[in-house]
């Protein structure tokens, strides 16, 4: 006689085993209609699963995050159902849930086109409109294997052979004549799966191994209702308009080419943004009392063997050789910083020692993963490492956190999600050391009034870490900042200092990144601002234009005055109509356009116009210079009179 306890504390008593759906129906027909699955004693189960003993139960609907994930997973099965009807010889591989949607990897003879996707989506809707029940069956491993072998599903057979124990009872989900395999849960009926959209295809190797066959990956998105789906599609449309690759080309910021995959060719305007960002970071480094250093971009393989990188990271490292020695091009800066720390005897009085570098790093990312500035092979890290005593960890972490928020606020990022990753099962260091380290990180976040979630077991083997994920104007998440404690690397590389008792001790090392990759952060900013960079970051801050040739000398005088004040100004003296010039520079997202006519020459003033089309009238040139300098120096996100 199971007693079912609901989230509100109420209880329901039954004299026989009941399904999740039975309990939902007992509560009310509305809840039963909305029931996708259940959470029984913390574990997600299908709506059809029986509860045979006392249990805590929560009914899962499409309004719950778990419900939406289940719905998306079932849409992947719906995709499988449709593709097998249209192209029966297709072999199905894997179809997991991803952020905002799902994908399915398929082995199909022809290359899928946009027309194929439209046809596939139409068939999916036709199937979903039948509102058929999804039937779950738990079977023996052998029965599951026989089922898929008989259907020619080689990839499902391989999953069973290589990933599933012979003692397991896999779950088979029946969508009419189509059968798929999954741990579940899944929706009980396809009426939940009406609001989806197939998006694109790409190539994907089976098992992610380039030695295996290339499959075709079909991506889709799915939501609980039409309103959510349309809102997401609108966000995607806006994201496409903001794509940094498109804007980068329009604004002539950078380019990339096949001869240097994943490497950035910065053009003048893009490099101007890079250097301005670098200047800002340098100012903050000085404010927070960091040294700036520069290490070599490649070092002997022997050093990387000592650090453990060669054993655990070799496939991502570029190598070269000279005079019978093998060198690794650095994928990160930390080993070099330890080498600098090791030069000369250090005392506890020298700590904390804060060391920063704009480090040029290279990582051998798979070519298929490269994506504009967001995923590159050559990048610059705004990397820093703090060497300190165990007693100093809390204060130093506190300082790092303040620096993160200080810098992010300058760019207008307000929503920052913070996670604290704690000790994994395999780790070095005593439990006492880990407890203290985790407590120090948590206390620093709490002292700064920062809410955070724990990620149990997600820390590195050498220490816990804090991750800062910023959300942009489209609510996309970008993990940029980290504060990572390291109990391992200093000892591996023989770093030490003389303690108060005149004994040698190993310092704690704090890895600290805020922007992460400079290239990636510029990509994020380009999309956040849609190319409308705040004036302090804009490559060209002001364009001064004449209406006729008679104002040319005055335009040059005004331009020089602006340039002498340190403002990035250009003169446009072309023999073009003023409306054409204004439109062109507006499209180039230049913050300010100054127009000189005869009236301005006579009065010694200048007509000021913003890129958003706001006419600020004719102003004294010195006033314009002062106001622009105030805006630039304050790194304001807003233009004059906004």
Swiss-Prot record:
Its EC number is 6.1.1.3. Disulfide bonds: none annotated. Homodimer. It holds the Pfam family tRNA-synt_2b. InterPro entries: aa-tRNA-synt_IIb, aa-tRNA-synth_II, aa-tRNA-synth_II/BPL/LPL, Anticodon-bd, Anticodon-bd_dom_sf, Beta-grasp_dom_sf, TGS, TGS-like. It comes from Yersinia pestis. This is Threonine--tRNA ligase. It is found in: Cytoplasm. Zn(2+) binds at residues 334, 385, 511. It is an enzyme of class 6 (ligase). GO terms for biological process: threonyl-tRNA aminoacylation. The gene is thrS. Binds 1 zinc ion per subunit. Its main location: cytoplasm. It catalyses: tRNA(Thr) + L-threonine + ATP = L-threonyl-tRNA(Thr) + AMP + diphosphate + H(+). Residues 1-61 form the TGS domain. The keyword Cytoplasm applies. Catalyzes the attachment of threonine to tRNA(Thr) in a two-step reaction: L-threonine is first activated by ATP to form Thr-AMP and then transferred to the acceptor end of tRNA(Thr). Also edits incorrectly charged L-seryl-tRNA(Thr). The keyword Zinc applies. Residues 243-534 are annotated as: Catalytic. Its cofactor is Zn(2+). GO terms for molecular function: ATP binding; metal ion binding; threonine-tRNA ligase activity; tRNA binding. Coiled coil: none annotated. Keywords: Aminoacyl-tRNA synthetase, ATP-binding, Cytoplasm, Ligase, Metal-binding, Nucleotide-binding, Protein biosynthesis, RNA-binding, tRNA-binding, Zinc. One of its GO terms (cellular component) is cytosol.
């Amino acid at each position: 006689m199971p007693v079912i306890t609901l989230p509100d504390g109420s209880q329901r008593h039954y004299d026989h085993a009941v399904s999740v759906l039975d309990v939902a129906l007992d509560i009310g027909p509305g809840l039963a209609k909305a029931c996708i699955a259940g959470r029984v004693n913390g574990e997600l189960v299908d709506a059809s699963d029986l509860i045979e003993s006392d249990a805590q139960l929560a009914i899962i609907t499409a309004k719950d995050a778990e419900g939406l994930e289940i719905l998306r997973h079932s849409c992947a099965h719906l995709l499988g159902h449709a593709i097998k009807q249209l192209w029966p010889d297709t072999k199905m591989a894997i179809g997991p849930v991803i952020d905002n949607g799902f994908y399915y990897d398929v082995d199909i003879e022809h290359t899928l086109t946009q027309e194929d996707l439209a046809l596939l989506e139409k068939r999916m809707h036709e199937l979903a409109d039948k509102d058929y029940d999804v039937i779950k069956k738990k079977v023996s491993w052998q029965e599951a294997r026989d089922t898929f072998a008989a259907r020619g599903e080689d990839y499902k057979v391989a999953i069973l052979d290589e990933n599933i124990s012979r003692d397991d009872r896999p779950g088979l989900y029946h969508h009419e004549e189509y059968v798929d395999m999954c741990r579940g849960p899944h929706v009980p009926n396809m009426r939940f799966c009406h609001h989806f959209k197939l998006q694109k295809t790409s190539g994907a190797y089976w098992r992610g191994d380039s030695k295996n066959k290339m499959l075709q990956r079909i991506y889709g998105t799915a939501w609980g209702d039409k309103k959510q789906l349309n809102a997401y599609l609108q966000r995607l449309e806006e994201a496409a308009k903001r794509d940094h690759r498109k804007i980068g080309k329009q604004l002539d910021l950078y380019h990339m080419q096949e001869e240097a995959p994943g490497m950035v060719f910065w053009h003048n305007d893009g490099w101007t943004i890079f250097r301005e960002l670098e200047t800002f970071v340098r100012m903050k480094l000085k404010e927070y009392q960091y040294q700036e250093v520069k290490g070599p971009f490649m070092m002997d393989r022997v050093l990387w063997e000592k650090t453990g990188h060669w054993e655990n990271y070799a496939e991502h490292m570029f190598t070269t050789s000279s005079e019978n020695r093998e060198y690794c091009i650095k994928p990160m800066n930390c080993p070099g910083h330890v080498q600098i720390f090791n030069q000369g005897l250090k005392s506890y009085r020298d700590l904390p020692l804060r060391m920063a570098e704009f480090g040029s790093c290279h990582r051998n990312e798979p070519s298929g993963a490269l994506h504009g500035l967001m995923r590159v092979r050559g990048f610059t890290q705004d990397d820093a490492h703090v060497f300190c005593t165990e007693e100093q960890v809390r204060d130093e972490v506190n300082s790092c956190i303040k620096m993160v928020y200080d810098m992010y606020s300058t760019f207008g990022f307000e929503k920052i999600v913070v996670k604290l990753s704690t000790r994994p099962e395999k780790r070095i260091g005593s439990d006492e050391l880990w407890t203290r380290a985790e407590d120090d990180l948590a206390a620093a976040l709490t002292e700064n009034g920062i809410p955070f979630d724990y990620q149990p077991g997600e820390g590195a083997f050498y220490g816990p870490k804090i991750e800062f994920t910023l959300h942009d104007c489209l609510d996309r998440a970008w993990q940029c900042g980290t504060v990572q404690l390291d109990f391992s690397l200093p000892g591996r590389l023989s770093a030490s200092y003389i303690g108060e008792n005149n004994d040698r001790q190993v310092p704690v090392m704090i890895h600290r990144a805020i922007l992460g990759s400079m290239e990636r952060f510029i990509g994020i900013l380009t999309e956040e601002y849609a190319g409308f960079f705040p004036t302090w970051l804009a490559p060209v801050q002001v364009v001064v234009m004449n209406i006729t040739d008679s104002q040319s000398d005055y335009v040059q005088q005004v331009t020089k005055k602006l340039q002498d004040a340190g403002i990035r100004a250009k003169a446009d003296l072309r023999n073009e109509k003023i409306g054409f010039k204004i439109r062109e520079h507006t499209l180039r997202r230049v913050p300010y356009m100054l127009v000189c006519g005869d009236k301005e020459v006579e009065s010694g003033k200048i007509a000021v116009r913003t890129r958003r089309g706001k006419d600020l009238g004719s102003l004294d040139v010195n006033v314009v210079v002062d106001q622009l300098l105030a805006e630039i120096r304050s790194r304001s996100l807003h233009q004059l009179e906004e």
